[in-house]
From Swiss-Prot:
Its main location: cytoplasm. Gene3D superfamilies: Bira Bifunctional Protein, Domain 2, Nucleic acid-binding proteins. This is Asparagine--tRNA ligase. It is found in: Cytoplasm. The gene is asnS. Pfam families: tRNA-synt_2, tRNA_anti-codon. The keyword Secreted does not apply. One of its GO terms (biological process) is asparaginyl-tRNA aminoacylation. One of its GO terms (molecular function) is asparagine-tRNA ligase activity. GO terms for cellular component: cytoplasm. Its EC number is 6.1.1.22. It comes from the Bacteria.
Length: 466
């Protein structure tokens, strides 16, 4: 006898007639007049539960099996048999069943076998992994995570753990969470009356990071190809389906690379990850296609078979101005493209994923390499049909004099970035990288539109429960 996951049974990893133990939670119980109960038991290893066929000959049939309800945890031992019913190849003829945990009051169990709105489930984030939709999201999220790590490992990248606490603002936007151990009821003050951060834990102001990019650049300029994959934070007071205060970012950095190099890297990474989901998680994708967004499978298959289009920002603006469409936000050179502009380009004009390159410098960050025209920077966004921007990246500014000029233009203090400037003084090299918002990727793959439903415990304005 061996411990078996539900997925391993369905994959045929246990021979018909072999005895296995499956551990999980009851989704439903159905009793027949012939004295047999049918338990649908799931363990999270795959979308479908396994059917346990439980005869009334078991010693605990009357006093336990017939009292099982949704949410009870069980340990079932039995023989693997071919299932005569439709929908699954195998089931378990149960010879022994142990109840590991009961549901106190089945009538008030929040995850009883009924359909819940996705909004209601957010209020029960500790229980929502038990639902079909959130369980499927979790498996797809894991599959994408593993695929991304696998991709970079196979491409010779080194994973770098960048700090979550920082004194640098990568984006220069100022929307950062402050980290402090000062007594808020008795703040130390300087002679000028300002908060004296010299008395704080780090001896200066410190924040939760908005990006691991600047730190990753330092490692790329020694190890050639690196990436980060971890949480980032934005104190942006936006209560929308597209914003989180805490989210995960994938950020590769490559030495001796230009904008075209990382555009190619972005395409290869996305296709690798999507192929992994199509190969490994078709059961979950089928659920999403049936109950969330009927286009998800076709969209991913189309994505991986499409060549990425490329267009300069200036040409993209001209396309949008001449397309005959009236947009909610008018298009002019110098604006940041909105979601409606991005989606028109990807879905209607190019009908494929598209890389928009060379944006106006005034709408981009200080670290992006200034182009020869003096007006644009070597920045890019990857736009995907169905969602718009999914990746943002750039060639980094490797010239110290130009970097200092850009810092001054954006009213940023050179001294705050002394170590970042040092990299341009000691063997500087052209280098480039991008950032992928991981939750946006999960949302795109699953069709689950609200970003709060693709991360286990969402953090947003006035939302920090659990």
């Amino acid at each position: 006898m061996s411990i078996a996951s539900v997925a391993s049974v369905f994959k045929g990893e246990h021979a018909v007639g072999s005895k296995v133990t499956v551990r999980g939670w009851v989704r439903t119980r159905r009793d027949s007049k012939a004295g047999i109960s049918f338990l649908a038991v799931y363990d999270g290893s795959c979308f479908n539960p396994i059917q346990g066929v439980v005869p009334n000959s078991l010693d605990n049939y009357d006093n336990e099996v017939l009292k099982l309800t949704a949410g009870c945890s069980v340990v079932m031992t039995g023989d693997v048999v071919e299932s005569p019913g439709a929908g699954q190849a195998f089931e378990l003829q149960v010879t022994e069943l142990e109840v590991a945990g009961w549901v106190d009051d089945p009538d008030t169990y929040p995850m009883a076998a009924k359909r819940h709105s996705i909004e209601h489930l957010r209020e029960l984030a500790h229980l929502r992994p038990r639902t079909n939709i959130i369980g499927a999201v979790a498996r797809v999220r894991n599959c994408l995570s593993q695929a991304i790590h696998r991709f970079y490992h196979e491409e010779g990248f080194i994973w770098v753990s960048t700090p979550l606490i920082t004194a640098s603002d990568c984006e220069g936007a100022g929307e950062m969470f402050r980290v402090s151990t000062l007594d808020m009821e008795n703040l130390p003050r300087t002679d000028a009356g300002k908060v004296d951060y010299d008395k704080d834990f780090f001896g200066k102001e410190a924040f939760l990071t908005v990006s691991g990019q600047l730190n990753a650049e330092t490692y790329a300029c020694a190890l050639s190809k690196v990436y980060t994959f971890g949480p980032t934070f934005r104190a942006e007071n936006s209560n929308t389906s597209r914003h989180l205060a805490e989210f995960w970012m994938v950020e590769p950095e490559v030495a001796f690379a230009n904008l075209n190099d990382i555009a190619g890297l972005a395409e290869a990474m996305l296709k690798y990850a999507f192929n992994a989901v199509l190969t490994e998680r078709m059961d979950d994708l089928t659920f999403f296609a049936q109950h969330v967004d009927k286009t998800v499978i076709d969209r991913l298959q189309s994505f991986v078979s499409s060549d990425f289009a490329q267009v300069d920002y200036t040409d993209a603006v001209e396309i949008l101005q001449n397309c005959g469409r009236t947009f909610e936000f008018p298009v002019s050179w110098g604006i940041d493209l909105s979601s409606e502009h991005e989606r028109y380009l990807a879905e209607e004009h190019f009908k494929a994923p598209v890389v928009v390159k060379n944006y106006p410098k005034d709408i981009k960050a200080f670290y992006m390499r200034l182009n020869d025209d003096g007006k644009t920077v070597a920045a890019m966004d990857v736009l995907a049909p169905g969602i718009g921007e999914i990746i943002g990246g750039s060639q980094r500014e490797e010239r110290l004099d130009v970097l200092d000029m850009r810092l001054a233009e954006m009213d940023l203090n050179q001294e705050d970035y002394w170590w970042y400037r040092d990299m341009r003084r000691y063997g500087t090299v052209p280098h480039a990288g991008f950032g992928l918002g991981f939750e946006r990727l999960v949302s795109y793959v699953t069709g689950v539109n609200n970003i709060r439903d693709v991360i286990p415990f969402p953090r947003a304005p006035r939302t920090a429960n659990f």
